[in-house]
C-alpha cells in the first residue's frame, strides 16, 4: 500500500511574514513563489501546511 502524497506549491512570498512562517516554508523545502515539492501526507506535514496556508496551494496526488 503506497502512502498518500501532497504536492505543495508556494504561491506567495514570505516577505513580511513572521520568523515562524519563514522557518516553516524552509522546512517544507520551499523558498520562492511557484516552487513545488511533494511530501508525505501525515499529521506533521498537515500542521506545517496549516501554519502557512495563506502562502501555499495544496493538491493530493
Swiss-Prot record:
Domain of life per record: Bacteria
GO molecular function: structural constituent of ribosome
GO cellular component, one term: cytosolic large ribosomal subunit
InterPro entries from the UniProt entry: Ribo_uL30_ferredoxin-like_sf, Ribosomal_uL30_bac-type, Ribosomal_uL30_ferredoxin-like
Keywords from the named record: Ribonucleoprotein, Ribosomal protein
Biological process terms in GO annotation: translation
Subunit structure of this chain's protein: Part of the 50S ribosomal subunit.
Family to which the UniProt record says this protein belongs: Belongs to the universal ribosomal protein uL30 family.
UniProt-recorded name of the protein: Large ribosomal subunit protein uL30
Organism: Chlorobaculum parvum (strain DSM 263 / NCIMB 8327)
Amino acid at each position: 500500500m503506497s502512502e498518500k502524497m501532497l504536492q505543495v506549491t508556494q504561491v506567495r512570498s514570505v516577505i513580511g511574514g513572521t520568523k515562524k512562517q519563514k522557518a516553516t516554508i524552509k522546512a517544507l523545502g520551499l523558498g520562492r513563489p511557484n516552487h513545488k515539492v511533494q511530501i508525505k501526507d501525515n499529521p506533521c506535514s498537515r500542521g506545517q501546511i496549516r501554519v502557512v496556508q495563506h502562502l501555499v496551494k495544496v493538491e493530493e496526488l
